[in-house]
Amino acid sequence: FDFNNISDIFEETTWENALDLACDGFNNIKSKLGPNALAGFGCAKGSNEEAYLFQKLIRTGFNTNNVDHCTRLCHASSVVALLEMIGSGAVSNQVADVTEAEVIIIIGSNPTVNHPVAATFIKNAAKEGKTLIVMDPKQVEISRHANHFLQFKPDTDVALLNAIMKSIIDQDLVDENFIKNRTKDFKKLKEHLKDYTPENMSKICGISTEKINEIAKIYATASASIIFWGMGVSQHIHGTDNARALISLSLMTGQIGRPGTGLHPLRGQNNVQGASDAGLI
């Protein structure tokens, strides 16, 4: 393509000319500076097919793995923890499962604003008598519908969640059968949590010992408990540890793998999960 023939103003041209211009420009960069001088940043609001084709273009056309999309900032920390602990970097169930839950926990998320459809499911479930527990450093809108609102101090997610797990252990509320048959290294977790008593962590996270013990019992003894979390948990210096704590909480009580239970990281855009699964990362 003759770059000298490019006009200073917009003018109509053919698809062939436009594509030649784009391709030659990329090829010039690749030949002069190498393939890693190029990168592609995709979109999580496209389809799975679009995500697959885009990453294929970058990897096979540009010959580089410099491809990414918003999940790197979004739930990358959650995906790491989920892959590490349950072998799947995806939600375990759909939002509509709140209709079968007895207890719903939302932490680090403002679904009324960011996930209005999901928020409607959750609000309707609360109106029908499901127990809604909201944990957040700020008073998000959905907390108005909550039976329990834990406004903990910023950056103390792990302290609060570890205290809840420690309380569950101390109250003998763990699911021994689930732990024996479907998990490993519970003894290591138990040892790790020995100093994270509700009394000690209450001073750090700002939630009373009594409330921590109450929430622990409500979550662990429910017939079905489900956890939702958002950017407040994942876009954090301790994001992976935050997610690990939530996953451990679910596993130690057997609150996963049944209708109305599970782990659901609320994605930042409508097809983050699909784009990630299609290789756009």
Regions found by a protein language model. Give the residues of each.
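Short, intrinsically disordered, charge-balanced linker/junction segments flanking boundaries
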Residues: S276-I281
